[in-house]
Regions:
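Short amphipathic alpha-helix that is part of the acyltransferase structural core
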Residues: 1-27
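Active-site rim helix/loop that mediates acceptor-substrate recognition in acyltransferases
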Residues: 20-42
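Conserved donor-binding loop and adjoining core beta-sheet/short helix segment
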Residues: 37-74
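Short glycine-aromatic motifs
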Residues: 41, 109-113
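Short glycine/proline-enriched coil/turn segments at helix->beta-strand junctions
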Residues: 45-49, 89-92, 113-115
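Acyl-donor binding region in acyl/amide transferases
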Residues: 61-110
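Conserved catalytic-core motifs of GNAT/GCN5-like acyltransferases
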Residues: 98, 113-123
Length: 123
């Protein structure tokens, strides 16, 4: 029997909360749960990891954006092809990831490349 979305969220909660530690305070656990339930975010659970994505509409492009990922790195990398297929099916022009620098090295062989650096400053 397939687990419900709530059961999967609870199973993945520690990974999501660990990833939220690097978000700069932009989201809390409750924001993620609400966003997944409202279909604003997409939830990608795996056996030993998970990711949370959103589709962002810019004036000239539609981007599939991975903004949270946690668990075993191999599990996250293994989602690349299915995530790309999903993004294409949604009419996305590209994919982006917000994460720590190590992701650039890990995903290089999957066709990813650094495109810019984001800096942050608390006010």
């Amino acid at each position: 029997m397939a687990a419900s979305i709530n059961e999967e969220l609870e199973r993945c909660k520690d990974w999501i909360e660990a990833a939220l530690e690097y978000s700069g305070g932009t989201h809390e656990w409750s924001d993620i749960v609400e966003g997944i339930h409202s279909l604003r975010y997409q939830f990608w659970p795996a056996e030993k990891g998970c990711a949370v994505t959103e589709i962002i509409m810019f004036p000239n492009k539609k981007i599939f954006h991975v903004f949270l990922a946690g668990g075993e790195m191999d599990q996250i990398v293994d989602m690349n092809d299915s995530a790309a297929q999903f993004a294409k099916a949604q009419g996305c022009d590209g994919m982006s990831i917000a994460g720590r620098k190590g992701w650039a090295r890990v995903l290089k062989n999957e066709g990813w490349a650094e495109s810019f650096t984001t800096l942050a400053k608390e006010l």
